[in-house]
Amino acid sequence: MAAERQDALREFVAVTGAEEDRARFFLESAGWDLQIALASFYEDGGDEDIVTISQATPSSVSRGTAPSDNRVTSFRDLIHDQDEDEEEEEGQRFYAGGSERSGQQIVGPPRKRSPNELVDDLFKGAKEHGAVAVERVTKSPGETSKPRPFAGGGYRLGAAPEEESAYVAGERRRHSGQDVHVVLKLWKTGFSLDNGELRSYQDPSNAQFLESIRRGEVPAELRRLAHGGQVNLDMEDHRDEDFVKPKGAFKAFTGEGQKLGSTAPQILNTSSPAQQAENEAKASSSISIDESQPTTNIQIRLADGGRLVQKFNHSHRISDIRLFIVDARPAMAATSFVLMTTFPNKELADENQTLKEANLLNAVIVQRLT
């Protein structure tokens, strides 16, 4: 085992030209797997300071002298140029040891493209497929972002003078989906859609999206948003700027509270309709009615805009009406209010009076907050 590790160490040093301590570090990190260690070494940029030895041109191949400005390009030259482009995308190739007739070739990781190159490629691909560069124009407040086509009726002109013009009614535009307008912003380290979050250029999950843009196609995730409608995509170049998270839209308070600004603030009901109906039923059942005694119906107009109608005996007191209101609207238990008649408008100050004594039989009572 030790001999195999020593052989791997010597071969690593021979291939990379690295120091023995550094070679041992990469081999130990790779579990003494020579291939993985070499790939890790070159991916880490360990070959930056190593001088590569150029291969000598075979002497057996004779070439005639040709002028330096030779304008004839052979098919072999085209293949050679294509191979060079593929090698730039694929990564550098390395030869790992072996004998005269055997050996192993290791392909390094692909060359990472800078964000500037990536953005240039996206704009270039979009222009090749019909995209048009436009200047950013500031819109007036009343200006729409997109002109609407004429959709009214009109007269169809005849082809000959003797033909009469016929009125043609306009057809309504049929929408199979909804039109979507999206702004793609290309930043220094990533891109964003409209006011969304930053998405990295290097994230594999974004590769298909960017490739669709480069081919001049609308990405699938944007087509799904339109549900069959038209997708208008604008691209903005911000490659020299760092991503700035947009400010969140203002969201108004949606809770409940009291209306201020008057001597008698309006109490906003916080109960749901079902809870309110349950409270009113409990309040009605809490009033004990003696059917053998005379009864009357009292209508109560509440300060929150509600209305209650309850049966009482003539012997019930005004204080019983107050308790009924509090049971029907528990939120008013801690609220100061008075009860008043409508015509004439008079406060019922003595709540110990019976309904008959206060002349409130079949009357309308109004609740007023104090």
UniProtKB/Swiss-Prot annotation:
One GO MF term attached to the UniProt entry: ubiquitin binding
UniProt GO cellular component terms: centrosome; chromosome; cytosol; Golgi stack; nucleus; VCP-NSFL1C complex
Sections of the chain in a coiled coil: none
Region (Disordered), start-end ranges: 54-73, 80-116, 137-157, 272-292
InterPro entries documented for this protein: NSFL1C_SEP_dom_sf, SEP_domain, UBA-like_sf, Ubiquitin-like_domsf, UBX_dom
Family matches, as Pfam families: SEP, UBA_4, UBX
Modified residues (Phosphotyrosine): Y167
Compartments reported by the entry: Nucleus; Golgi apparatus, Golgi stack; Chromosome; Cytoplasm, Cytoskeleton, Microtubule organizing center, Centrosome
Biological process according to GO: autophagosome assembly; establishment of mitotic spindle orientation; Golgi organization; membrane fusion; negative regulation of protein localization to centrosome; nuclear membrane reassembly; positive regulation of mitotic centrosome separation; proteasome-mediated ubiquitin-dependent protein catabolic process
PTMs per UniProt: Phosphorylated during mitosis. Phosphorylation inhibits interaction with Golgi membranes and is required for the fragmentation of the Golgi stacks during mitosis.
Source organism superkingdom: Eukaryota
Protein's UniProt keywords contain Hydrolase: no
Motif (Nuclear localization signal): 109-115, 172-175
Residues bearing PTM Phosphoserine: S74, S102, S114, S140, S176, S192, S272
Described purpose of this protein according to its UniProt entry: Reduces the ATPase activity of VCP. Necessary for the fragmentation of Golgi stacks during mitosis and for VCP-mediated reassembly of Golgi stacks after mitosis. May play a role in VCP-mediated formation of transitional endoplasmic reticulum (tER). Inhibits the activity of CTSL (in vitro). Together with UBXN2B/p37, regulates the centrosomal levels of kinase AURKA/Aurora A during mitotic progression by promoting AURKA removal from centrosomes in prophase. Also, regulates spindle orientation during mitosis.
Subunit (UniProt): Part of a ternary complex containing STX5A, NSFL1C and VCP. NSFL1C forms a homotrimer that binds to one end of a VCP homohexamer. The complex binds to membranes enriched in phosphatidylethanolamine-containing lipids and promotes Golgi membrane fusion. Interaction with VCIP135 leads to dissociation of the complex via ATP hydrolysis by VCP. Binds ubiquitin and mono-ubiquitinated proteins via its N-terminal UBA-like domain when bound to VCP.
Protein name (database record): NSFL1 cofactor p47
Native source species: Bos taurus
Lineage: Eukaryota, Metazoa, Chordata, Craniata, Vertebrata
Gene assigned in the entry: NSFL1C
